[in-house]
Structure formats: C-alpha cells, structure tokens
Amino acid sequence: MKNVHNTIDEARLGIMLNDLRLPTIKTLWPQFAEQADREGWPAARFLSAIAEHELAERAHRRIERHLAEAHLPPGKTLESFAFDAVPMVSKAQVMAIAAGDSWLAKGANILLFGPPGGGKSHLAAAIGLALIENGWRVLFTRTTDLVQKLQVARRELQLESAIAKLDKFDLLILDDLAYVTKDQAETSVLFELISARYERRSIMITANQPFGEWNRVFPDPAMTLAAVDRLVHHATIFEMNVESYRRRSAMEAKRHRGRPAAFATTKSASLIVAERQSEHDETLASDNQHDTFMPTAT
C-alpha cells in the first residue's frame, strides 16, 4: 500500500513540476532524493542541490537561445584572434569590453576602423560571443541587410516598431557600414536607428572609412555630423590600420609554394655545407686508404 501511495505522489509531483516549468528538477529529483536519504541530508540541502541544477540548466538554455538569435559568424573567438598582428589593439582592453557590465548599461558604443581584412569583423564577432556567454543579448548583422529590412518596415509604416524590437538586444553589431549605398532612403533609416539607440542601447560598428570619409555614406552633411556625434559620444574607438590578414596569408603561401627541398629543411645553410664537406672529406680519405693498400703490378 505504501508503494502505491509513493507511486501516486511521484506522479503528482511530476505533473506539478511540469506546471511550474521545472524540467531539470523533474528529471533529477529521484537520484538526489536517494542520495539525500542515503547520506542523511537535511531538507534545505536537498532543495538547494536540485534548485542549483535547475538554475544552471536554465542559464545554459538561455545562452543557447541567445547564440541562435545572434547570427554570429562561426569560429570567431577571442582565443583565435591574432592580437599580435594588430599591436595597436590592447588585449587587456578588449577583455574588459568583452565582460560588458558598465559600458553596455550606459548604452556606450564600440567603433572599429581599418582597411578590409584587418580583423575588424572577427574582433566584433568575438566580443559579441563573449558578451553572450556573460549573459548579454547581441545581434550581428551586415549593415546593408538590416538597412534593407528597415526600409521595408518604413514602406509598411512599421519603422518605429521594427527599431523598437531591436531594443531587446543589448548590443547591435553593424558590420561593414561602408557598403551602405549613398541613397537618402537607406541612410535615413540608418540614422533613425542610430538616433533611437543613442544613450539607451549600444552599437558596435565596423567600417573601412574613417569619419572624414563618411560623406560617402551619408549624402547630407548635417546628417553625417549628427550621426558621428551620436556614435562618438561615450564610444571606444579602435583604429586597426594593418595589412590584410587574407593578403598576408596569400603572400606567405606564395613564398613557400614550389621551394626546392633544401629550403624546406629546418637545418641552416652553414650546417648543410659543413655536412657536405664532411662527406666529401670522408670520401677522399677512403680513396687514399684504398690507394695505399693496393698491391703494385708486377
């Protein structure tokens, strides 16, 4: 009879845990209850143990959801970023930024400038990934893609609503700002986005052109000045003026392609010469020894 009551109680408990949306506790409580009985845990320790696992699993699922919605390019991490190739970027400063905290709470911005291939997008995505792992929400998008979506929203009289929906992201990463066409319709929705997030939600921008060339993006000088003013206020700026990583890799591969075997060895040229000279000397010595003991003809 006792087993029947236990079975009914366990079934009811499972239903209640489902209603309370506690799937991890529902899965783990039997094994923790057995351990608690075996080791004589007080009730508080038992409840604390299963609650801790529930919270940890919720945090894990939340990070997975945030990673899925962020659309980050794969494989871009701070661990794989070549800080030594971009000496003007402080690794310590980047690590502090990747923690989030105060600058995101203030709606501050991060601006990354430099020629194509210098690692701007990699660094932006890597910071975004670290922020998600620290509990923040991030969206990574090509600037042109987002601008086109906002233009559609404007035509449907939904621009304000579309911009408001982006407020759920603590950080909006706009990649390749320079590729926005110099068109009043496109740049105006971009300006409205920048204005709406000013001092409220953070923006990170990667761009090939410095501010002095932003008249190529914003056709209206007054709009250019206003956009720059809002972005620079409370901003951290990285000037990544280095040679393209892709170009460096291609040139390195070209230098190594088709080299003779001698150039592929790890031995130095002087060591190779010395070894060849030694082999030559040994050959001469062997020939001399052979000549000495050769019997003379009669």
Curated annotation (Swiss-Prot):
SMART domains according to UniProt: AAA
State a single Gene Ontology molecular function: ATP hydrolysis activity
Gene3D superfamilies named in the record: P-loop containing nucleotide triphosphate hydrolases (3.40.50.300)
What does the entry list as the binding residues for ATP?
114-121
Per the record, which residues fall in region Disordered?
Answer: 276-298
**Similarity section:** Belongs to the IS21/IS1162 putative ATP-binding protein family.
Its keywords, alphabetically, are: ATP-binding, Nucleotide-binding, Plasmid, Transposable element
SUPFAM superfamilies xrefs: P-loop containing nucleoside triphosphate hydrolases
Q: What is the lineage of its organism?
A: Bacteria, Pseudomonadati, Pseudomonadota, Alphaproteobacteria, Hyphomicrobiales
Q: List, in alphabetical order, the GO biological process terms annotated in this UniProt record.
A: DNA replication
Q: Report what the protein is called.
A: Putative insertion sequence ATP-binding protein y4iQ/y4nD/y4sD
